[in-house]
Amino acid sequence: MVTIKVNNLIDFVAEVFSHSESSPEEARRIATYLTTANLTGHDSHGVIRVPVYIRWKKTGNVVPNQTPEIVVDTPSLAVVDGKFGYGQTVTPFAVRTGIEKCKKAGLAAVALRNAGHIGRVGDWAEMAAAEGLVSVHFVNAAGSLLVAPYGGVQKRLSTAPYCVGIPRQGQDPIVLDFATSIVAEGKVLVASRGGKKLPTGALVDADGTLSEEPSVLYGPYTPDGPRDHTQGTGAIRAFGEHKGSGLAFICELLGGALTGTGATSGGRQFANGMLAFYVDPKVIDTSNYFDEEISRYTDFIRETKPIAGVESVLVPGDPERKMRAERTRNGVPLPDDTWAAIVNTAREVGVSEASIQRATS
């Protein structure tokens, strides 16, 4: 395990993307969002993605420095084509569009199509919450067959994230952000690179056997080699049986089919689609009841007596706040295999040995 200071990690990852044709501004933006995912404890959406992103750039699956385009524009609705730009570039544009429309109309919807990997969806809910807005996000990943629907063994769904953000007055927002599978694909990636092990039965093999071995999804792999989910015989399982499977299906239809990205299928270019709704609570809540009631109910939930083995009952966003404070203070821990893969990628794009050494100093 190697632990890297937050600013060092951002600087190093930004240098990797700068060496791969991203502008300095885009490179730092990508690095900051990826590192922020690590800070919140979501290592699956953090810097472990660097080798994948660079591989996608080399194969033309993602385009550096892309300018998204608004292709449908009404007072309360927009469709944004990301043109396969990095998600960390095109998604903020789409979210800002939704925020601006919502502040004028009180309610807005924005469909983002053809985006590169948009990272931790909670970032975009937090962005809206910082402007005082509630947001709901339905996301799919076209070209990313990973998850077996309830009762099946074959990959038919993406991990299809769902996210809700609720602003608080003078406090961090409440953010619920989860893949509709038992684990996100990035969690399998983390486990395959020496990180946290998968929950029992998170995967299902072609014969219906439940497993927690990453090779079920990726097939055989070497410690610092690539991971390819098309090579494994199995799939990730949907969470909550028919409920998670059903929600994933809806995310595919709204985040994928309705946005124009397309519901996921094999043999096509990867792209995230996101349908996001934005609501200004001040338009609805003219008596300022909303935030007071959130405070009351949040306290009511947290005061629940925990079962044996559980320290305390939490609400969405609590684990991320705790982890962010800890890692901001102590640095970001990365398994040796994860760091080795990132360093190998850095060398491939021409980052100097001095920069590599400086990252861990």
What are these regions (language model features)?
Residues M1-V6, D11-I30, T35-T36, D43-P64, ...:
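Acidic, glycine/proline-rich low-complexity segments that act as flexible tails and inter-domain linkers
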Residues T3-F12, H19, L258, A263-S361:
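Catalytic-core signal marking the mid-to-C-terminal active-site face
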Residues H45-K101:
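Active-site cofactor/substrate anionic-group-binding motifs, chiefly glycine-
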Residues I70-L77, D81, F93-A108, E212-G232:
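Residues forming anionic-ligand binding surfaces in small-molecule and nucleic-acid pockets
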Residues A78-Q169, V175-S181:
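A generic, well-ordered mixed alpha/beta core segment in the N-terminal half of proteins
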Residues V147-P223:
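Phosphate/diphosphate-binding glycine-rich loops and adjacent basic-rich segments that engage nucleotide
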Residues K197-A263:
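Secondary-shell segments that build the walls of catalytic and ion/ligand-binding clefts
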